[in-house]
């Protein structure tokens, strides 16, 4: 099965409740109350407009800044799979610079922000909405996101499809 975004958020919050971390972004639809935010470095904010590919670079930049100020915080990038796929060069930088980071990928098998936009444009222009996913869905074949992490020199786990397996992976 699939793990829903709310379940993922709650499991992540529980698994990391005692961690000192800097969340650099969260995917569209992530519940805003899922994480305790008390310090300016707890959460850097959203990337604005769901811009694909920005998340990994923002996370690496944050990790470098935290290293510079000698912070003990771990950088956590909660990304959609589209953002992750478009930002693999930044993922490689995280590995080569040995940055203490966690990339948590919420995989909906889509460049969803763009797919959703395509649906709205199709509706507005009276075009078939069933064509909107063309070039937006990441299926057949679905990329092996964990293998891509390993190919960059990082550890990679997944896909995790059972909520019971999630805490150990985090």
Predicted segment positions?
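Short glycine/serine/threonine-rich phosphate/pyrophosphate-binding segments
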Residues: 54-56, 83-90
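Short gly/pro/ser/thr-enriched loop/turn and capping motifs at secondary-structure boundaries
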Residues: 30, 51-52, 84-85, 109-113
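Active-site diphosphate/adenylate-binding microenvironment
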Residues: 1-69
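General structural feature for long, well-ordered alpha-helical segments within catalytic domains
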Residues: 4-12, 16, 39, 87-90, ...
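A short, small-residue-rich loop immediately preceding and capping a beta-strand
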Residues: 69-86, 101-106
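Thiamine diphosphate
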Residues: 96-170
């Amino acid at each position: 099965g699939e793990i829903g975004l709310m379940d993922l958020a709650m499991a992540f919050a529980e698994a990391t409740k005692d961690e000192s971390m800097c969340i650099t972004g969260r995917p569209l639809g992530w519940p805003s109350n899922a994480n305790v935010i008390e310090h300016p470095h707890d959460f850097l904010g959203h990337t604005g407009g769901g811009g694909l590919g920005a998340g990994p670079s923002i996370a690496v930049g944050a990790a470098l800044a935290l290293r510079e100020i000698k912070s003990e915080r771990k950088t956590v990038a909660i990304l959609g799979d589209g953002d992750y796929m478009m930002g693999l060069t930044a993922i490689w930088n995280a590995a080569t610079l040995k940055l203490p980071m966690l990339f948590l990928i919420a995989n909906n098998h889509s460049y969803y922000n763009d797919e959703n936009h395509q649906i709205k444009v199709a509706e507005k222009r009276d075009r078939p909405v069933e064509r909107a996913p063309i070039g937006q869905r990441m299926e057949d074949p679905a990329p092996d996101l964990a293998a891509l992490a390993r190919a960059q020199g990082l550890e990679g786990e997944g896909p995790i499809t059972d909520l019971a397996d999630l805490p150990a992976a985090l």
